[in-house]
Amino acid sequence: MKKFFIYLIFSLIISNTSLAKKSGCTGGNCNNGFGTWTYTDKTTYVGQWENGSKKGKGIETWPNGYVYEGQFNDSKWHGEGTLKFPDGSSYTGEWQNNKMHGKGIFKWSDGKVIEGKWNEGEYVK
């Protein structure tokens, strides 16, 4: 369970892409359409944009191996999505404002699984 909370805390940290300094649109339309944005730390977002914000389907990839693939709203993880960790662990389920929120499944790389509900990033049942 301790490892789960470490993953949870790290997912909250990396989900705040405002920590990554913006470098710019490196392909497509990053205002209204489909485009690629690359940050100075080499984090990338490839997906849909609306009014300059991530909205709709997209993939956010960090140089250290973390990958979020799913729905975005107002540049936040929001809706259905999967966060994959470098060690092979993953969370698939509902997100709200960059936090696990609603039904989801957390799978550790060793095969352990927690399935249930999350409330603002905390497992409730």
Set out the residue ranges of the language-model regions.
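Glycine/tyrosine- and acidic-biased, solvent-exposed loop/turn segments at the edges of beta-strands
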Residues: K3-F5, L12-K125
